[in-house]
């Protein structure tokens, strides 16, 4: 199965802290580290350049100039150029980013939101896959609103999929995300398993109660991953803002994950110990 060698992400100044975690954890678990493609703005590009990373980082410095200094609340209050709000425009930049990255990465690119924290090496993609998506694995009432798949973690290698994705954004029920199930129609689709891109929503909005889902988490100490398991398999990545303090769902999820990592922080799990030290400074 093909390995992932290229990552793409969006980052303005409000995502710098998240991006530090993304790059640190990509470096921690992958050798060599994947090449990273970033859409950013002129103000944020120097901040990104200053983040330590052993792999190559390509930055399109003016791609997000229209969003310089703006957070999600700011963007949602402004009219967009293409869509109803500037935030809808911003999320659709993912389609342009993927097309740009694929110009030099014909074997495929994994898009990651900047707030992805890797806890193990990158997953592999099965041969013959056209599109790899991450299901939310949440209640149907929530997928009806937000989409079956999460737009913060996906892979493809055909640039035409980026164009189709942008077209579908025009009628999507939730920004660039609610249309992903339509993008998957008539494609050779691979769905990432539960251990990949695990967000707070999977724990708090799951079909089963949180107490049942928490029981799926376990510990298996080994140097090849953080040592956290879900359904007895290594947890590959989580989707969270580590610096978030005001949003309760995110904050409680962070405490839950960090408590597991801290239990694993020992001489037998050196990389996990390094990760805990890094996260404690966020």
Task: Please place each PLM-identified region on the residue numbering.
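GT-A fold catalytic core of metal-dependent nucleotide-sugar glycosyltransferases
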Residues: 89-144, 148, 156
């Amino acid at each position: 199965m093909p390995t992932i060698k290229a990552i793409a992400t969006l980052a303005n100044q409000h995502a710098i802290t998240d991006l530090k975690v993304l790059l640190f954890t990509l470096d921690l678990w992958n050798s060599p580290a994947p090449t990273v493609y970033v859409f950013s703005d002129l103000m944020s590009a120097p901040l990104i350049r200053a983040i330590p990373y052993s792999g190559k980082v390509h930055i399109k410095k003016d791609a997000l100039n229209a969003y310089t200094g703006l957070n999600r609340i700011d963007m949602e209050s402004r009219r967009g150029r293409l869509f109803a709000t500037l935030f809808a425009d911003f999320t659709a930049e993912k389609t342009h980013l993927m097309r740009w990255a694929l110009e030099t990465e014909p074997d495929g690119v994994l898009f990651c939101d900047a707030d992805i924290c890797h806890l193990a090496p990158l997953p592999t993609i099965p041969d013959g896959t056209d599109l790899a998506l991450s299901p939310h694995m949440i209640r149907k009432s929530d997928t009806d609103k937000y989409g079956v798949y999460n737009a913060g973690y996906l892979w493809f290698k055909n640039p035409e999929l980026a164009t189709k994705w942008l077209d579908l954004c025009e009628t999507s029920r939730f920004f660039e995300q609610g249309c992903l199930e339509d993008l998957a129609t008539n494609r050779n689709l691979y769905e990432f398993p539960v251990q990949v891109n695990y967000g707070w929503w999977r724990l708090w909005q799951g079909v089963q109660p949180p107490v049942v889902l928490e029981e799926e988490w376990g510990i298996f100490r080994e140097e090849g991953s953080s040592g956290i398991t879900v359904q007895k398999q290594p947890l590959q990545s989580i989707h969270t803002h580590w610096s978030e303090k005001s949003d309760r769902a995110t904050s409680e999820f962070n405490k839950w994950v960090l408590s597991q990592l801290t239990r694993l922080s020992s001489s037998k799990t050196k990389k996990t110990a390094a990760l805990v030290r890094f996260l404690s400074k966020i």
